[in-house]
């Protein structure tokens, strides 16, 4: 998860929607498999915002996802 977190932050910094969408998609699948439905939900929200190119929603959904990852990794 720490590596995925860094990829998300780098993608945001670079404005790389493809990376954000791809990493969110990977996390969406992994969350359910490892028993973290909250991770799946937040990753899906980010993936959907990226797919729809809803630029105003992306920072907030990314922040929610990164905060959740931080909670898991504590």
Language-model region placement:
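Amphipathic, coiled-coil-like alpha-helical segments
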Residues: 2-5, 30-74
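Conserved alpha-helix in the HATPase_c
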Residues: 22
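Helix-loop segments that flank and shape redox-cofactor active sites
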Residues: 3-19
